[in-house]
Amino acid sequence: VANPTAVDGAFADALAAWGRLDTLFNNAGIGSFSTTIDEIPVQTWLDVVSINLTGSFLCARAAFKIMREQSPKGGRIINNGSISAHAPRPGSIPYTSTKHAITGLTKSLSLDGRPFDICASQIDIGNALTDMAQAMTTGMPQPDGSIRPEATMDVTHVASSVLHMANLPLDANVQFMTVMAPKMPFIGRG
């Protein structure tokens, strides 16, 4: 997703196959956790920014172009934010920074998309049990320095939430949604 040529090619293929684009779920992402800023290799920072932010920008840009030009115009771009954008984890500077930036991308897309019937929204997901989140069940660093297991939820709850957002008509939008395991640390995390 961080290669502009590959992204543009994928969207061109989708347009050729289906004739239009109604929804983009910007869902690619990687994490880098467990160290302080002075120990983060610059390449790690660049890798996380490249996938999480540049990749989301490139996909949104390609989708926006198609949605703006198709007839009837319009569509929906749903960005995968994160609870970490609002309540960071210890040692998560690259990941958290990109997720803050996704919120800015979402707000700007919402504003720029209005004249073209393009809705933008964001889902902030917390502790959905995927391969990326498996470590949460055995223990994650907490703000007090301890390592504790965290509650997780079935990833199908995320899927049904995204489908709800995607299925709305273009005269309605869920601007921001948070879906999370209710017993995970979030409110009062730090």
Set out the residue ranges of the language-model regions.
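The beta1-alpha1 cofactor-binding region of Rossmann-like NAD(H)/NADP(H)-dependent oxidoreductases
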Residues: 1-10, 42
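Active-site loop immediately N-terminal to the catalytic Tyr-X3-Lys motif
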Residues: 38, 87-93, 150-151
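Substrate-binding pocket helix/loop in short-chain dehydrogenase/reductase
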Residues: 35-37, 44-49
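C-terminal helical subdomain
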Residues: 122-123, 142-188
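Active-site helix of classical SDR
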Residues: 60, 98
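Residue(s) in the substrate-gating loop at a strand-loop-helix junction
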Residues: 82
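Alpha-helical segment proximal to the catalytic Tyr-Lys
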Residues: 65, 111-114
